[in-house]
Amino acid sequence: MAIEFKLAPLFCNGAVLCRRKEVRVWGTAADGQTIAGRVTTADGLILSEGICTARDGRFLLHLPPMEQATSCTLTVHCGAETCTSTDISVGEVYLASGQSNMELELQNADEGQDLIAAHDDPLVHYFNVPKKSVWDDDAIAAEAASHWERVRPGYARDMSAVAYFFARKLARTIDCPIGIIDCYWGGTSVTCWMDKEALEATAEGQRYITRYREQGGDKPFDQWRQEEDAFWVEMNAWNAHVAQLKKDNPGISWPEINETVGPCPWHPPVGPGSPYRPGGLIETMTKRVVPATLTGILYYQGEDDTAKTEHYDVLLTAMVMRLRQLFRDDSLPFLNVQLPMWIAAGDEDKHDWARLRLAQARAASALQPGGLAILLDCGEFDNIHPTDKRTPGERLCDVALRVVYGMDAPESPRALGKYTQGDTLVVTLSAPVLRRETGELLLEIAGEDGAYHPVQSVTLDGTEMRLRSVAVLHPAKVRYAYVNWGKVSLFGRNGLPLAPFAFEG
């Protein structure tokens, strides 16, 4: 069967290509065919061009770096055949990945409906990678239909809200086209976005593979499909009961809901087609846009891994290192969102979200260039999907402005270290902090025995905090905001919250 000459959907009309880097453009063509491509301006000026030979049914063009531009045309020739994409922009391109809080669409976010109806931003574009966990005919058809959209009235309802607010602020700040490649799935572990090579590179990843297999992950595909269908019948019925309860009883709490209809039947069955399997979605989603030329990666994930925090930083680091390999950029910036405050009504605070935040911070230190957007003053009680997505999106943009563009942008103060003076433990900070009258102190100190007690006296002195507790005569350890849910009171002079920290050595 002859191989059709065509461009990958990522390079269709309206695409955004990355500026100031070699741009990789690919598609399919018969082996041995010579492929020539170029990007031209509206008046015919050639911005970049390249040539390659198709192998194994694919071609990969390497186009020399370009400066930013709009209203361009991408033309690719194969013999007498031509593929032409119009309305091409050259600017900044970010992959937006993670789970449900990155997935939450603009139409469901605060301000979303008004923005969808009225906002026209010719500089912001997005491309939704089809959400497919199995590569089959449906996935092939969905990929063929995928396309770029520009933010304009009536559109962008299905764009990641976090990515939207990130892109809007970035476009306004640097006056450049911004392309967002949306690639996420709610309820996923970091291991879903790691391929086999990344998982097997660490003992922690290998344990996930073994555990999933032991749970039945290698069962026959047809068996998994039957179990999956039965699960969604049950899940949809449960959701319908919950929706009716909320309609009949506005303000009903989750404990009351669970008592009436029973606990949520989540999780779906394991199996070879599950989107929640280790090493799955990276193959059926992320790698469909590899090896695109990117400016950076945006990531908001971790909620699903709070029960397994002890190895999260190792896994996250391995994931990013592998993504940098796949996208052929060892210094690709990784811009992460730290989890906000959250707890379900009636739940005991087990500090698992606090531990996950600290793991995210450890990974951020190891993954330079990169940064972490601090959301310690954000989150909603009993709602794991807060609808304020402007704050995380714009704080993530501030991280990009500092890390990627070398600009001066607001940053949360951070703890740099600690030392002791008698019965006082002193924490050194990257910037001075102020204590607000509202909120909790959330500072604890401990001696060598590791028994933590609330700080009773805090003195803020420039870039130092002096902490004391009558219960700890010889302080050696300190931690801040070691809770799933709380209202913080320590902020920088720029209004951003002090980042959570723990010094236990």
Language model segments and positions:
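Cell-envelope and extracellular/periplasmic
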Residues: 1-505
